[in-house]
């Protein structure tokens, strides 16, 4: 019987009597993959041409890490994907500059989670879709016009002039965006909230 590969972490499942003289190295690699999945950390630049996290059979791979820090400045709406068959949890730090673009974390052909700039996430993949378990919403400084995602917490500085913040285009019930007058300048240089054709509750 030949070796096989596990569905999610792509571990090498060794068949009885196989791999004479090499089973130790295969076992060590499996242990390194498990270490990645339990507590591994990697940084992934989303502006690279390849935005699919890798799951190489029988080898350590960036998509097998538990913690992934996403970096880079978006020039368009982007998606980071994992293979459809993977069942796994992730801790995601979104350190990207969205530059008024969107970033989604999903399976190759399923649904996923729209990530808000500056926030951190606990996600899981059920082998079909990526689901959000929790979101840590972090305050970040803004001093220029921007279109934001639900969950944004903005320290808005209008010291250099008025600023317009445009809300998400397709809001859902319960979505929130928070603003703070960082420099106490709203009375002089206004913050304008663009509704994006939706109603606002405050």
Model-derived segments and spans:
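Acidic, glycine/polar-enriched metal-coordinating patches/loops
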Residues: 2-9, 71-137, 157-202
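Generic alpha-helical scaffold signal
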Residues: 21, 61-62, 84, 171
């Amino acid at each position: 019987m030949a070796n096989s590969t596990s569905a999610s972490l792509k571990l090498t499942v060794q068949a009885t009597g196989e791999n004479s003289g090499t089973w130790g190295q295969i076992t060590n690699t499996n242990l390194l993959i498990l270490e990645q999945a339990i507590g591994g950390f990697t940084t992934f630049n989303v502006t690279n041409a390849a935005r699919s996290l890798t799951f190489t059979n029988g080898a350590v791979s960036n998509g097998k890490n538990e913690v992934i820090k996403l970096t880079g400045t978006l020039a368009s709406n982007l998606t980071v994907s994992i293979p459809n068959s993977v069942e796994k949890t992730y801790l995601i730090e979104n350190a990207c500059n969205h530059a008024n673009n969107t970033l989604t974390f999903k399976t190759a052909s399923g649904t996923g989670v729209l990530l808000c700039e500056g926030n951190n996430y606990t996600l899981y993949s059920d082998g079909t879709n990526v689901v959000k378990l929790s979101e840590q919403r972090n305050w970040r400084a803004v001093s220029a016009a921007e279109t934001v995602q639900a969950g944004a917490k903005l320290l808005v500085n209008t010291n250099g002039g008025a600023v317009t913040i445009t809300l998400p285009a397709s809001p859902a019930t319960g979505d929130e965006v928070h603003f703070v007058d960082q420099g106490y300048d709203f009375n002089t240089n206004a913050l304008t909230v663009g509704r994006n054709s939706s109603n606002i509750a405050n």
